[in-house]
Amino acid sequence: MTQLYETMYIIRPDLGEETVDQVINQYQSLLRDQGAEDVQTQHRGKRRLAYEIRKFREGIYVQMNYKAAGPLVANLQRAMRLSDEVIRYLTICQDEPDTDVEAATA
C-alpha cells in the first residue's frame, strides 16, 4: 500500500553546485527505480542552521514529496544515513488530500 511522504534533507554547504545536483538526482533516481510515484523535488537553497551540525553552520535544504510503500522509504533513509553529503534528514507520512473540497467547506 502506498502512502504520501515528504522527505526534507540537508546537504553539506561546502559542496559544489554540480555535486549538489548529482546528490539530488541520486535520491530522485533511487525513488523512481524502486517504484515511487509523483516524485516532486524542491531545491530550497542554502540557509543558516539553528544549531551546528557536524561543524556546519549552514546547509542546502531539499524537499521531496512522493507516493511510495514503507520499505522504499526505509531504503531511502538508509542511503541518506550512510551518505557523507547529507548531514540531516527527516521523513514524515502525510495524510491524503481531500478530493471532495465542497464537502470539507460545507
From Swiss-Prot:
Gene3D superfamilies: 3.30.70.60. GO terms for cellular component: cytoplasm; ribonucleoprotein complex; ribosome. PROSITE patterns: RIBOSOMAL_S6 (PS01048). One of its GO terms (biological process) is translation. The keyword RNA-binding applies. Keywords: Ribonucleoprotein, Ribosomal protein, RNA-binding, rRNA-binding. The keyword Ribonucleoprotein applies. It holds the Pfam family Ribosomal_S6. One of its GO terms (molecular function) is small ribosomal subunit rRNA binding. Belongs to the bacterial ribosomal protein bS6 family. Binds together with bS18 to 16S ribosomal RNA. This is Small ribosomal subunit protein bS6. It comes from Cyanothece sp. (strain PCC 7425 / ATCC 29141). The lineage of its organism: Bacteria, Bacillati, Cyanobacteriota, Cyanophyceae, Gomontiellales. The gene is rpsF.
